[in-house]
Amino acid sequence: MNILITGSSGFIASYVIEKLDQSNNIFGFDLKKTKITQLIFDIRKDLDRSKLPKKIDLIINLAAVHREPGHKPNEYFDTNILGAENITSFAEQVNCKQIIFTSSISPYGIEDKLKIEDTIPCPNTPYGSSKLAAEKIHIAWQNRDIKKRVLTIVRPGVVFGKGEGGNMSRLVKLIHKNFFFYM
């Protein structure tokens, strides 16, 4: 199976790639080169098909601008929405029938109620809005051939673990420095 993974140098991708059957042909795309990333590429641009096989069986779209706060609002939209448009367009060009898209819990917005799959999204940040728009782009791709295309949207909450450098790691460092925090 030929698998294209965007955001291949990221935290989640490193774990996904480790768990994939190594008999697959894995093609990693990212902005920075790592042992996992073979192709340096910006998903805000059209994908260069010349460096890939003619057939891609699965796209795992993990590329995103995600730290919040930390980016200008337009950066979330530029990467997350343009990236979704370019990935789904590429999927159509190579006749890929399956995409896994990693969104976020952020499209639900900040509310104290339990979130379930049927909870109506109400994002209140540029990041959450950009992820919801990217979900809709992926859904539109699937709907253009719903009988043959498979789309899985994953909305993780806080992602952390060994090697993660985000919010949980910062929180743990602050706790070790005896900083008070309130949630």
Cite the ranges covered by each PLM segment.
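Rossmann-fold cofactor-recognition segment
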Residues: 31-46
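Active-site Tyr-X1-5-Lys
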Residues: 125-152
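A conserved pocket-lining segment of Rossmann-fold NAD(P)-dependent short-chain dehydrogenase/reductase
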Residues: 173-183
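Conserved Rossmann-fold NAD(P)-dependent oxidoreductase catalytic core, especially the SDR/UDP-sugar
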Residues: 86-126, 149-152
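N-terminal Rossmann NAD(P)H-binding glycine-rich loop of SDR-like oxidoreductase domains
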Residues: 3-22
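NAD(P)H-binding glycine-rich loop region in Rossmannoid oxidoreductase-like domains
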Residues: 43-82, 90, 108
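Glycine/proline-rich active-site loop of Rossmann-fold NAD(P)-dependent oxidoreductases
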Residues: 132, 147, 160-170
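Glycine-rich NAD(P)-binding loop of the Rossmann-fold in SDR/ketoreductase-type enzymes
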Residues: 75-86, 121, 125, 129-132
